[in-house]
């Protein structure tokens, strides 16, 4: 080897090695430039261009926008192209010879507008909603942690299922899918607050009143949603109004299908707290059946805080007590005027689009 190096010469060897490195670097640069200029249109970027075209279209045709909250309208790619707002889809997508079509749905969200493109390109690509993606990778189970079919809802149960979502720059857990809308709870405590501290005539003191519709907790969460501390304007476009199940419940009641809590609802709220029955259903402990069962803290991914936090549900046997989860994950009743943490609960739009992730803590789901 030494003789070979001497025969070639060290300088020539360095030049040869340098030339090889240079060629490799040149190839890499060429590939990057090719990707930048010729394969820049990923399907996701095409969806973004379709949405931009729809925004320009409705900017010129504002009379066609949905008038009332939750109303929807749609426009297809053929209309956008023929009107001059969008180029030929077949020339925009990364795969040649693929026939594509798209529809943009516009939803009135609290008098703002959410635009969602649904792009289909043969068997090469199909826009995937978040709920459809989860259903395709998370088969429902009947034992162990995971996604369960319960009372017509898809409910995550167990100690640590893959139900993490990164949204509004924070981690959330998917509690369940209800009518294809994901119910999320913040995976941390947010703000310490009384549930309510109004004067209670039965108690003759400020122990609070356990009616969520007129509670301090409702006021605090409504202000939180309306502000910008937790959600940006674009975040709010993905949050949909939902009827909160605020029915009161006794400690020993064992109906966990939501019928008790849903006996009274607070309509069209964008943010709330977790109803008692949802906490009970998350636990896999076979003895967990009511609020009086301490074992509901077992095998329960919602039992993760070292502080107490409020539930949405009031006590049906009193006018001042409310359910909360203590620092050990045990369900208990306490005065509404006590301080505990709020864990906001929201619902994502059923047409929220899956962007990435596998639901683990290290790689949470991403949506748009």
Language model segments and positions:
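Structured, soluble extracytoplasmic/luminal domains of envelope-associated proteins
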Residues: 87-126
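Extracellular/periplasmic head regions of type IV pilus-like filament subunits
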Residues: 66-103, 221
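Gram-positive cell-envelope targeting signals
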Residues: 1-49, 360
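Conserved hydrophobic/amphipathic alpha-helical signal-anchor segments
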Residues: 34-73
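Collagenous Gly-X-Y triple-helix signature in extracellular proteins
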Residues: 125-368
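Structured segments of extracytoplasmic/periplasmic soluble domains
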Residues: 53-60, 83-84, 177, 347
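Substrate-binding/catalytic groove segments of enzymes
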Residues: 60-65, 84-91, 319-322, 351-355
